[in-house]
Structures are given as structure tokens and as C-alpha cells.
Regions:
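A short, structured surface patch at a secondary-structure boundary
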Residues: 2-82, 88-95
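Stable alpha-helical elements in mature extracytoplasmic
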Residues: 20, 30-34, 40, 77, ...
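Ligand-binding cleft/hinge of the Venus flytrap
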Residues: 39-41, 54-64, 104, 187-201
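A short, gly/pro- and small-residue-rich
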Residues: 43-44, 102-115, 236-245
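Beta->alpha turn/N-cap motifs
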Residues: 92-96, 229-232
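Flexible, glycine-rich surface segments
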Residues: 155-243
Length: 245
């Protein structure tokens, strides 16, 4: 709501969120990039997981003190959150994360950013329209989404014409554990739309599935492409260190 004079009917289960947000605590680097695309940098008051962020202007703002470094998204810095006094917290509801701990008890409105739980790439992309309304950028967000949607469908029509489908193994292990997209996830759909044969397309479910290194290696040896997402510079030596196979 934009009517700050409305009578309060907040409870433990329900909070009033006043829009547009002017000082948000953003917990994911993904959403920082999205907000930057919409031109809402000034509404970002604090961010988590700075080490995963590649936006130079945000890092500079943190260095200058214009944006608060809130630490880990799993255990945000409570003192800095209190000092920030944000309009809302924007965390992602990662499975088995244990919630936000003490941050949930501070009384700030929490807007769970569940876009990663969508089972199609365009379904996830359309969440920008929701964020656009939170930050007073509805028209900008709608325009961005329509461009992305049109381009995505155009690319899909091209990949459907290909005769060969390279076999794809995605991801790397995290802390020694492989977790790969299940068949109903947006990632699996993305691989399919890109014209690849995802070698673990038989994994049931909509999220991710933990797998043993043995199983990944056994089937991964059949892959033509190993698709790795990494937030920094990556070389073969580092891959061998992080992924001893």
C-alpha cells in the first residue's frame, strides 16, 4: 500500500508493506542485478553475500558506506540491519536454510523472493514485474520482461531446428556435495530450450537433487559439455582442486 495513513492491522502473520520501497535490504546478488537493470540502485540500502556480487557500482557504494554490507544471507548482521532500519527485507526462501534466525524477530516486513522456485525460465523472469511494483518501476519492469520474453521465444524457435543435441552436465559440487537440477526445475527447462540433452533429466521433482560424486562421474563421463557457473576467475587447476574426480 502507498497510503501510510491507513490504520494498522498488523499481526505476527501479517505486515503492511508501503511502496515504493526506498531502503531495502537485498539478500541475493541476483536481485541486486535485477534492481540495477530497473534503475532502482538508490533504493538498495543494504546487501548480503557481497563476495558473489559483480556490480562495481554496488561494491563502490558499500566501500563508501552508502550501502550497508549485511554479511551472510544465511546469518545477516543484526546490528547493521537495525541501524539500516529497512523498509523491507528481500531474502530467498532456500530449502533447509533454517530461516533468517534473529532477523525474523526484528519486526521488519519480509518479502520472500521465491522466483528461483519457478519451473520455467520465463516464469522466473516474469518476477521482475512483481519487483517493479515494489519499487515503483512497473512500466520499466513490464517493458524489460516483454523484451526478454520475445527474445527467449525467438531463440527457442531456432534451437528447435537443430538436429544435434549436445549432452550436458551442469554445476560443480559445493562443500563436497553435488546438487543438480531436477527435471521439473527452471534450469532443466532452460537446458532443454537451449537445445541440450540434460544427462540427469530423469531426476524427479521441481527443485534440486543431491547426488553422490560416484553417480555424477559415472554419467558425467558421457557429457559433451560441462557447464559451470562461477562467481570469479576459473582455471583448470582450480577446477581440479575444487572438484577432485
Amino acid at each position: 500500500t502507498t497510503e501510510k495513513s491507513l490504520p494498522s492491522y498488523e499481526s505476527r502473520e501479517r505486515k503492511i508493506v508501503f511502496i515504493p520501497l526506498e531502503r531495502a535490504a537485498v539478500f541475493s546478488s541476483v536481485h541486486c542485478a535485477l534492481l540495477h537493470e530497473m534503475g532502482t540502485d538508490k533504493a538498495v540500502g543494504g546487501i548480503c553475500d557481497l563476495e558473489f556480487l559483480n556490480l562495481a557500482n554496488y561494491k563502490e557504494a558499500v566501500k563508501d558506506g552508502r550501502i550497508a554490507n549485511l554479511g551472510s544471507s544465511m546469518q545477516p548482521n543484526i546490528e547493521r540491519l537495525i541501524n539500516l532500519n529497512p523498509d523491507a527485507l528481500l531474502p530467498s526462501p532456500f530449502e533447509n536454510s533454517g530461516g533468517l534466525g534473529r532477523a525474523e524477530k526484528l519486526g521488519f516486513p519480509i518479502i520472500w523472493c521465491a522466483d528461483y522456485m519457478e519451473n520455467t525460465p520465463l516464469g522466473r523472469a516474469e518476477w521482475i514485474r512483481f519487483y517493479g511494483r515494489l519499487f515503483g518501476k512497473a512500466e520499466v519492469a513490464d517493458s524489460i520482461f516483454h523484451v526478454v520474453e520475445s527474445r527467449y521465444k525467438e531463440l527457442c524457435s531456432l534451437t528447435k531446428q537443430t538436429q544435434t543435441k549436445p549432452r550436458l552436465l551442469p554445476e560443480m559440487p559445493w562443500s563436497g556435495q553435488w546438487t543438480l537440477p531436477s527435471s521439473g526445475s527452471y534450469s532443466a527447462k532452460l537446458y532443454q530450450d537451449a537445445g541440450a540433452e540434460y544427462i540427469f533429466a530423469d531426476l524427479k521433482g521441481n527443485g534440486s537433487t543431491p547426488l553422490s560424486t560416484e553417480k555424477v562421474v559415472d554419467r558425467g563421463m558421457q557429457a559433451d559439455i560441462w557447464l559451470i557457473k562461477h562467481h570469479g576467475t576459473l582455471n583448470r587447476r582450480q577446477i581440479n582442486t575444487d572438484t577432485p574426480l
